[in-house]
Design a protein with these regions (language model features):
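Primarily membrane-embedded glycan-assembly and transfer machineries that use lipid-linked glycans
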Residues: 2-180, 184-186, 215-334, 340, ...
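A general, composition-driven signal for non-globular sequence regions
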Residues: 10, 193, 287, 318, ...
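Aromatic-enriched
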Residues: 69-76, 345-433
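Transmembrane alpha-helices and membrane-interface helical segments
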Residues: 168-179, 208-209, 213, 217, ...
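Membrane-interface alpha helices of multi-pass inner-membrane proteins
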Residues: 185-209, 320-327
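Transmembrane-embedded, aromatic-rich helix segments that form part
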Residues: 200-212, 222, 336-338
Length: 433
């Protein structure tokens, strides 16, 4: 069989997988949209309305404007200012309590603002996905439709959460991180800093600089992050005094009653809460939460540092993103939208994986991707799949490191023997002369 025929067979396999994925995604997406619209209409676009509200008040941190207590630094919502202007009169009524969220969601100006924002963001995500995958023809179409229907994306759409902005920045970071062009690598640093300024936890991706011994890039990205996080406070009434307010709002939000037990909270804290409730041992909640969260941080750092010379392309990205997503005290399911990146890597390098890894990773990704779960607002299976993916990523990286270490030990005696043989040959030649 010729090499061209083999490559064609590999392409057809991925194309078939994407076709059936797309078909299942479309059907379950429509079902999920109908269910969510009927069951949670009063909460539709709640996050988007909240983000836009931050843009039109003088201070979104102190609570002086109704129930507005932002947990995000200004950079996270300032890019939404133009979208807020489109529906400013309706937003003002919403903030004053004149109209409800449900009424706001029916306002034409708000709908236009939302559709415009999501059309732009979705177009960018799909364009970046196409560039990352380098797929063409039917395969590209199947991929893009599947991404559009991806459950975390659907949930993000239903809520109108601004995490899509952070997702775009992280995608740009990974696209340009290893670029041969210096300006692109520098832009990657800025993108990561921007992602950290939107949702602070992407700062965990700084570990990649440590893994690859790129300490100058690490320092520059930290500097960019500080600038993007703190400098925009000067544009807000109260300036840097709001830093204390944002911290109080953040701790209050994470400690909100019932958030840890929510079925759409996919974080380790939520998992610990469910285990403690199941065993009727409330004391276990805090212990397990700290063990899972900080244990994952330590293991991820060790795994990444040991994978400096790794040939694995997906696993380092996967475990870092999952650690970021699962570590958060309150981590709603839309945070899994970042898995678009490792899923694309998985599909691009599909034939390089063993049969076990193809099935294992594919099954876990499929469970997370099922859009109907977004409609049901139920992500327990996605949560368990995310944990399974994290554990498998650890196993693959540590296993590879162990194998490489053994191979290196086996090569060392051979090298010594070759050196000794060479020395004997030289000595023999000198005696003959």
């Amino acid at each position: 069989m010729s090499e061209q025929t083999i490559n064609q067979t590999k392409t057809n396999t991925v194309q078939k997988i994407l076709f059936w994925t797309m078909l299942a995604s479309i059907i379950t997406f429509v079902a999920g949209l109908i269910i969510y619209t009927c069951s949670y209409w009063g909460h539709m676009f709640s996050d988007f309305a909240e983000t836009l509200s931050y843009c039109i008040v003088k201070n979104p941190y102190t609570g002086e404007y109704g129930n507005i207590h932002s947990i995000y630094p200004p950079f996270a919502f300032l890019p939404f200012y133009l979208f807020a202007l489109i529906c400013k009169p309706a937003l003002t009524q919403y903030i004053d309590g004149t109209i409800t969220l449900e009424q706001l969601a029916k306002t034409p100006s708000f709908i236009i603002s939302f559709l415009l924002f999501y059309a732009i963001c979705m177009a960018i995500v799909l364009l970046l996905s196409a560039k990352m995958s380098k797929f063409k023809g039917k395969k590209l179409v199947y991929l893009l439709v599947s991404i559009f229907c991806f459950a975390p994306f659907a949930f993000c759409l239903f809520r109108g959460n601004n995490i899509i902005f952070a997702c775009i920045l992280v995608m740009l970071f990974f696209m340009m991180y290893n670029s041969e062009k210096r300006w692109q690598r520098e832009l990657a640093n800025v993108c990561l800093a921007g992602a950290a300024a939107v949702k602070i936890y992407p700062a965990l991706l700084l570990i990649f600089f440590i893994k690859d011994r790129r300490f100058l890039d690490l320092l520059k990205t930290l500097l960019y992050s500080v600038i993007l996080i703190f400098l925009p406070f000067l544009l807000i009434k109260g300036g840097f005094a709001n830093i204390k307010e944002i911290w109080n709002n953040f701790t209050h939000f994470n400690g909100g009653e019932g958030r840890d037990a929510s079925w759409n909270n996919i974080g380790f804290d939520g998992l610990a809460s469910k285990i403690a409730t199941l065993l009727h041992l409330p004391v276990l909640h805090s212990i397990l939460s700290k063990l899972f969260r900080f244990g994952s941080i330590i293991v991820t750092i060790v795994a990444l540092c040991l994978s400096h010379n790794s040939k694995q392309k997906m696993q380092p990205v996967l475990i870092t993103l999952l650690t970021y997503e699962l570590f958060q005290g309150v981590s709603y399911a839309y945070t899994l939208v970042f898995l678009i990146i490792p899923i694309i890597i998985y599909l691009v390098n599909f034939e390089e994986y063993s049969k076990l890894n193809k099935i294992y990773y594919g099954t876990c990704f499929a469970v997370i991707a099922l859009p109907v779960m977004a409609g049901l607002n139920f992500f327990l299976f996605a949560q368990l799949s995310a944990v399974c993916l994290l554990v498998k990523g650890y196993i693959d990286l540590f296993k590879e490191y162990s194998t490489l270490k053994k191979e290196k030990k086996l090569e060392t005696p051979q090298t010594n023997e070759q050196t000794e043989d060479k020395a004997e040959t030289i000595e023999s030649a000198e005696q003959q002369n």
